[in-house]
Amino acid sequence: MCLSRWCIGGVSVSYVLIFMSATSENNKRIAKNTLFLYMRMLLIMGVTLYTSRIVLQVLGVEDFGIYNVVGGIVALLGFISSSMSISIQRFLSYEMGRKNYEKVSRAFSMALQIHGIIAVVVMMLLETAGIYFLRCKMVIPIDRMDSALSVFHCSVLACGFSIVQVPFIALIIAYERMGLYAYIGIVDTMLKLAIAFLLGWIAYDSLALYGGLMLVATIVITLAYVMVCHLSFKEIRYQCIWDTRLFGSLTRFASWSALGEMAWGFTLQGVNIVLNLFFGTVVNAAY
């Protein structure tokens, strides 16, 4: 028997209204987040197409191809952080749903430490095996090898910073702050557009300069993610801990998506490298 004055099927009307209000708020949040993501995607897509055209004009076909294929070597190992990102978002979102912010902090701290280790390992692999492959196997003109090596070193450092970004991006997405995510993505795109214009104004080796400026842009965006998370999510703080059980859970969950991410990465970048081995940098510029 329902004790409330107004009941529908034995359920208090007040509870129904609360549920409807919560559902309405959720729908509004989903719609707003979707709008932010679509705006981000469209703006980034448009600006990137325009930026690529400018960079191609400034660098020339050969240097543009060198940058693409050198960056492709670095990007081959990007599947590791991509697969971990999905795992981190899952654990952060689960603990947030339980309002257990202590465990959210622990999961975030573990994720940050894991990605720090991944960044170091990936950079070491690239600076050893990657350098050998670039020098001995890739088809790059002799007079552009020094510039290609400069781009490679900058790309390796940028890769390390990009890997460290992943836990902060996962935290923003877990909090459903898509506006912040969209704004930082737009700033990143604008920085790359500014770099494209700067290339034509600075009298220096354009290929090496482009690699260095792209590294600076990656560092700036990484710092932006760190500052935004520090200021916006005060209940989440880094803890210097090591939870073996949580480490196992994160890596096991990530292993399910690692194979797909690896296949996708090798499909995109592996073809680029194979094209270079057989046809040279001009074909890489067209790929």
Label for each model-derived stretch:
Residues 55-76, 107, 207-212, 246-257, ...:
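Interfacial/gating helices of multi-pass transporter permease domains
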